[in-house]
Structures are given as structure tokens and as C-alpha cells.
Amino acid sequence: MSDSDMDIDDDEVEQKVQVHTIVRESELFDKPPIQASNSHNDVKRHSVTTPLDEQSKIIKEQAFAQDNGTLPRFPAPGIPPRSFFTGGGGNEPEQKRAALPCKFFAKGWCFNGVSCKFLHVKENSNCTSQQLAENSMAGNGGIRSDLERRILDSREGVRVSQLSENGVTSLPTREDISFMNPQRVFSSMSFVNPPGSQRVFPFNNEMRFMPSFENIRRESLKQTYGADFTDNRSLVINNANSFALRSSFVHEHRPSISSYLKTDMGSAGPAWTGSLSSSVPMNDRASTVGDFENGNSLSGSGSLPTLQGVAVSSDKGAEANTTSTKKKVSSDDWEPSEPFKASFTIPPYILPSSDALYDPFTDIENLGDRPLNDSLSSKGEHARKSSCQQKDGDSASGPQARDCKNDDKSSSCSQNQHQETVARSLEAHGVVEGVATSVVDQNDTATPSKEISSATAAENRVVLKRIKPAGHDSWHRSDGSSYKKTKKSDEIDGEVRSDAGMKVMRLFRTAVVETIKEMLKPLWREGRLTKDVHNMIVKKAAEKVVGAAVQFHQVPTDTESVDQYLGLSGTRIVKLVEGYVEKYGKP
């Protein structure tokens, strides 16, 4: 072909492009402008800096693709989106290098948002996998041209922007799905515009699906969740809410959806091939189930699932698995995925048991059940019996001894009874040992009954005086000793306070009496008062002054305060003394 023919073809292509751009402008004026997403902003920003020769090549490719019916309408006429894919070889010189990822966004410091010139890639996503996928797609031997990749990129960006504007924030973005298989992505997106159907492209935040896809979607949902699900929920409609499920369905069918995902993912193996959701991690799949519709998840047979992660395959085995997992859904079937466990648990060996609790009554010794007391009492009885037998053997020598034996038996029996009562009374106070030893010593002595009884009583008193405080303290070891000590300390403090108060009162009373006597001295010298009247006036006046001071809590405590008190109340004391003198003195 000659150069003139090439020029003529270029002119014809430019005329066709102008005609198509005029038609697209007239159609776009009837529609409101689309709020482009991050990818479209990047497209417009980078397309401005594209050289003129590259723009002319891109316009030619668009015109060729439009004639074949494979190019959708773009929101901005004449400005094609820039491809972010890197070139696979030297045969594509018009491709530009991929945009660099934003380092500040990965650290959470980027404040530019949509206007940032770099790609916003999450930390956990593989940044190099996108470039590898793009290189593999670019090196497919010329099967898919650069224009097709640009179309795929623009469609993905527009759909992501629409889902983000409709309130769905958990949809995977361009960066999130960069690690997917490019062959699977292209196969799922290549039949968006099938022959014999209307063109699918979003306008004004709406997504228009084909009727065949709508029927397939309803049938798959009826087989999976029942007929009432598709009747009560408008899943495929031409409005802005086509990607959002109702909250009531989310609350009612969330358990069945999660169980369906777990069973189908574990058993249906090959049924997940050919969909975007098969390459999404399990945690992302489980977190977004029931929250939005995934329009990009298309299976190889052409069925369109509505929930992300629920992919209906054309395999018969997959259909059997999906139908076998159906069950009746109710709002009361909620169960936690894991049993409740407290974040902090106390080990059982730290908690005090009922046996380990303190019992104050265990400190009180039950002296009646002590084996020591039993042994001591048995020793005392054995000693008394042996002493009686020894006395009987010694007194068998003569008749006088027999008479004494009878007397001694009666006296010893009475003595033993008395000592047993004393020992029982003393056992309660912890003096069994001392009493037993004293009883043994007393039984060994051959004294008359009166002397024995008097000596026993005296010795018992000594034993009680010597041993009772220790026994009493041991008896009340838990609470009695402390109470007794505090009582003694209180008594001591009270006595000290009373002694100090008595000294203060004595000092104050003496000062008052001396003051009254000084007032009565002139009258005493004149002879107007007798001795008895003088003493009576001094006594009554002193009691009156001291009683008033005690009543109003004005008793001075030292000599200076006493002098000050008497100086301030001197006039009242003088009037009081004059009154008594006029009453009891001589005229």
C-alpha cells in the first residue's frame, strides 16, 4: 500500500471518529455527569499529558473497535483512559510504565486522597503481582490488544466507583484484586456485551443487567435460598440500590449464608473455578457475605450470582451440593461461632475453697475431747487407786491401823470426790496438769481430813493464781486476749484522764476558795462574820463558781488560765459573795 493510500485511510478514520464523537456528545448531554472514581481521575489526569501522536493512534484504535461493536461509550469523548499496564515487549512502544505505589498511604500518612498521583495499595497486598499480571496479559501473542486491556481497566474502575458511591465500602478495589489470575479476569469480563443483547454500561450510578442474566440470577437464588427470597427482595433493578441488599435479609439469612459458604467451599472443589470470588481470601469472603451483590463474579457457564463468594457453576455436582445444603432459615437460629471465653480467667487453685476459709472456732480448743486431758485424768485416777492400795497395805499391821483405815477411807473418799469436782472445774481453765500433780502429792501424805482439805484448798488457790491467766489467755486466744488487753488499756487511759481531771479541778477549786477568802478578809476582821458563817459562805460561793465553770466547759487547766478566768469573772464573784454576806452575815 502506498503513502497516498495511507493518508486517505487516515482521513476517513478521522471523519468517522468525529461523527462518533458528535453522537456520543449528544447522548451524554441527556444524561447527568458520572462521578468518576479514583481510576477515572487518574485516567483524565494522565490523558492530558499524553502526546499528540499517541492520542491519534488511540483514536484510530477506538474507531476500529467501535465499528466492530466492542468499544463501550466513555463519559469523556475523545479522551481515552490511559493504561496502567507495563509493556510486555518492544512491539508496543506506546505503553507507559505503571504508576508507582504511594508509600505514605501504606503507612497511613497520605492526606491527598483522590488527588494523589500515586497508587494507593494496601500493605498486605502484593504490589508486584499487579505488574506481573499485566506483563502476562501483554505477552499473549497479540490475542488481546492494548485497547482491550484499557477497556477492562476502565470498566473495573467505573464499577468500583459505583459500588463505593452506593454505600458499599467493603468491595475489593483495583489494588485488592491485583493478585488474581488475569486469564480468569479477562474470561469473566469478555462476555459482558454478548451478541444479541443490549449494551451494558453504568450511567448515573446505575447498573443495567440483561434480562437473561436476571432470569438466571432468580433461578439460582430460588434453588439456593427458596422462592420467598427472590419474591421479597428486588435484587436486579435499574436504580441506585441494585447493589445493596436489605438489612432484614442480612439479619435473617446470615447464618445460612455463612454455613453455605463453609460447606460449599469444602466440598464443591471444581465448582468454584471460573469466578473472581474463588481467588478472594476466605476471611474477606466471610466478612462481606450478605452485605452487597458482586456483579463482577461471573461463572464460566454464564450464571450470575448475587452474593460474593456464592458462585453457581454449570457442573451437576456443584448443583447437587448447593441443593443439599438448603435448610429452613429462621431468625432464632443464631449461634456463636465459638463458645464464649472470658479474656481473663482466674485459675481454680487461686480461688479460695470453702474448706480454706478461716473459721475462728477452730482456734478454740475443745478441752473436753482432748486426749491429753484424758490421759492426765486417767493418770490421776491410777495414782489415787495406787495410793489407796498402798495405804491399805500399810494399815493392815494392827487394829489401830484398821480403825484409822476406816476413818482414812471415809476421809479419802470424800477428799477424792472433792478433788474430782475441783479437777473438773479446773479442766475448763486449762489447769488439769497442775491439779493432777497436786492431787498425787496430797494422796501420798497421810494427814487428817481437815488438814488435807484445808491444804488442798490453799494449794488450789495458789495453782489458780499461778496458772489461770495463762489458761484464760489460751482459752480466748482468738478474741478474748485482745479484748482483755484493750479493756485494760482503756481503763488505764480512763484512770489517767480522771487523775488529770481531778488535779485540774483541785487546782481550780483551791484558787477559787483563796479568792473568796481574800474578799471576806475585811468583813472577817470587822467581826461581821462568825467562823461558821465564813466557812459556809466560802463553801457555797466556791461550789457555785466551780459548778458554773463545769457546766459551760470553761474549767481552766493551768495556773495562768485560772488567774485569767478569775480576773474576767471577778465582778460576778464579788456580787455573789456580797449576796451571801447580806443573807448570812450580821447587819
UniProtKB/Swiss-Prot annotation:
GO cellular component entries: nucleus
Region annotation (Disordered) ranges: 264-346, 368-421, 467-492
UniProt-listed InterPro entries: Zinc_finger_CCCH, Znf_CCCH, Znf_CCCH_sf
ZnF (C3H1-type) ranges: 96-123
Keyword Zinc: yes
BP term (GO), one: cell differentiation
Keyword Zinc-finger set for record: yes
Pfam families in UniProt: zf-CCCH
Composition bias, Basic and acidic residues: 470-479
Subcellular compartments: Nucleus
Residue stretches of biased makeup (Low complexity): 294-304
Keywords linked to the UniProt accession: Developmental protein, Differentiation, DNA-binding, Flowering, Metal-binding, Nucleus, Zinc, Zinc-finger
A molecular function (GO) term: DNA binding
Summary of the tissues where the protein is detected: Expressed in root and shoot apices and vasculature.
Assembly, per entry: Component of the transcription activator complex FRI-C composed of FRI, FRL1, SUF4, FLX and FES1. Interacts with FLX, (via C-terminus) with FRI (via C-terminus), and with RIN1, a component of the SWR1 chromatin-remodeling complex.
Domain remarks: The zinc-finger motif is essential for transcription activation.
Protein task: Transcriptional activator involved in the FRIGIDA-mediated vernalization pathway, but not in the autonomous flowering pathway. Acts cooperatively with FRI (FRIGIDA) or FRL1 (FRIGIDA-LIKE 1) to promote FLC (FLOWERING LOCUS C) expression. Required for the stabilization of the FRI-C complex.
UniProt name for this protein: Protein FRIGIDA-ESSENTIAL 1
Species of the source: Arabidopsis thaliana (Mouse-ear cress)
